[in-house]
Structure formats: structure tokens, C-alpha cells
């Protein structure tokens, strides 16, 4: 069996940055790691509960965390920030206050920034959310994948591979289906990728969605 590595982890330190940037003493490391997990889970649940988009695509690309001695800076990368801010203008301030209480920051300030993703459908997390919404609405797997690839091509991606695994279309035996368009050099270390692995719960069980998007290549 082939051993499959996470393409983002493989490229850390070459052309991929960490999503959390901070330093900690060895004894306090696990506590800081749990704090990061709590921040990400809280923000994801907050955006999910707001139900900002009728299509079911929340548009959350990623959450980056930067920590200093007196400051925690959280950057939320959203594909559709207008929906969040128009739906609830005071939402960002409310999120900041609630999260600060949840974390028990003490003397540290919490600062939340929202950054817009210029081409939302060039991000694998947003595309995976779109496919998950289609599968929940009983659209066939092949059709959902093809539509996602069309959206990615409109966003000028250089290459994309979409894979869905599980009981596809309610079949008794679990299968894997994938489609690739353009160039996807997964073995090349200098090739920059965006990647996500996204589970979706359907009436037939849990399906796994994986998306690789080829961004470019370092010279």
C-alpha cells in the first residue's frame, strides 16, 4: 500500500508556512496548542451557527493565529466576508468579547481581523464545503465534483484534483471516485499546493472529501 502524506506538512519550511506562529516553554506547549484548538473550534462553530449563506457555503478558508507576550492576533480568511458583516454588523465585536471570556486571556489582548479571499473558489476548503452541500442535497457525486472543478477553473487555478470516498450515492460497498483537471504534480516538493481533507455526514454515512489545488512552482 502507498503511504500518503499530507502535502502541506511535506512542504513546511520550503514553500508552506505554519498556520500558528508563536513560541512557548516546553512545559506550556501543550496548553498553548489546546488554546489554538479552542480558538479555531469556537470561530468555526460561531460562523456555522450564524447561517450566513443560503447556499450552505460558509466560506471559511483558514484561521491563522499569531501570539506575542501581550497579544493574541487571530486572522480569519473568509471567501464571503460581506455576508457575515451585513447579516450581523456587531458580530465581529461580539465574537471578540465572547472568545476573550472563553479563553480567559488575563493580561493578553485578543485582536480578530477578517481578511477577504480574492478568489473564493480557488480555495480547497470553500470548494469542499460546496461539494458537501451538494451531497447533502442528494446531488450525484460525479456531478458535484464536476461543478466544483468548473468553479475552480473559473477562478484561474492551474490544476485541481477532487476525491470523494465512502458509500457513494448510497451504494453498499465503499468506493473512491476522483477527477483531475490541469497539472497536479503532487510528488514535486517545490510545487506549491492548497489542500484540504473534509468529512461530510450524509444519510448513507460519512464521506471523505479531499481536494488538491496546484498554485504554482518555485523556480
UniProtKB/Swiss-Prot annotation:
GO terms for cellular component: cytosolic small ribosomal subunit; plastid. Coiled coil: none annotated. Residues 39-118 form the KH type-2 domain. It is found in: Plastid. Keywords: Plastid, Ribonucleoprotein, Ribosomal protein, RNA-binding, rRNA-binding. It comes from the Eukaryota. It holds the Pfam family Ribosomal_S3_C. Transmembrane segments: none annotated. The keyword rRNA-binding applies. GO terms for biological process: translation. GO terms for molecular function: rRNA binding; structural constituent of ribosome. Its main location: plastid. Belongs to the universal ribosomal protein uS3 family. Part of the 30S ribosomal subunit. PANTHER family: 30S/40S RIBOSOMAL PROTEIN S3, SMALL RIBOSOMAL SUBUNIT PROTEIN US3C. NCBIfam families: rpsC_bact (TIGR01009). HAMAP family: Ribosomal_uS3_B. This is Small ribosomal subunit protein uS3c. The lineage of its organism: Eukaryota, Viridiplantae, Streptophyta, Embryophyta, Tracheophyta.
Amino acid at each position: 500500500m502507498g503511504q500518503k502524506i499530507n502535502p502541506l506538512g511535506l512542504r513546511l519550511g520550503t514553500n508552506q508556512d505554519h498556520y500558528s506562529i508563536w513560541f512557548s516553554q516546553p512545559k506550556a506547549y501543550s496548553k498553548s496548542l489546546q488554546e489554538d484548538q479552542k480558538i479555531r473550534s469556537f470561530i468555526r462553530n460561531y460562523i456555522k451557527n450564524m447561517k450566513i449563506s443560503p447556499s450552505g457555503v460558509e466560506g471559511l478558508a483558514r484561521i491563522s493565529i499569531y501570539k506575542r507576550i501581550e497579544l493574541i492576533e487571530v486572522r480569519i480568511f473568509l471567501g464571503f466576508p460581506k455576508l457575515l458583516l451585513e447579516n450581523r454588523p456587531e458580530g465581529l465585536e461580539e465574537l471578540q468579547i465572547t472568545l476573550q471570556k472563553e479563553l480567559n486571556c488575563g493580561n493578553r489582548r485578543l485582536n480578530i481581523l477578517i481578511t477577504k479571499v480574492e478568489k473564493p473558489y480557488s480555495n480547497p476548503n470553500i470548494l469542499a464545503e460546496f461539494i458537501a452541500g451538494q451531497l447533502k442535497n442528494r446531488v450525484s457525486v460525479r456531478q458535484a465534483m464536476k461543478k466544483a472543478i468548473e468553479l475552480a477553473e473559473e477562478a484561474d487555478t492551474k490544476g485541481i484534483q477532487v476525491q470523494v470516498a465512502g458509500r457513494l450515492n448510497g451504494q453498499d460497498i465503499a468506493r473512491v471516485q476522483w477527477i483531475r483537471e490541469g497539472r497536479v504534480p503532487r510528488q514535486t516538493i517545490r510545487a506549491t499546493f492548497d489542500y484540504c481533507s473534509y468529512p461530510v455526514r450524509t444519510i448513507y454515512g460519512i464521506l471523505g472529501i479531499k481536494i488538491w489545488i496546484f498554485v504554482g512552482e518555485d523556480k
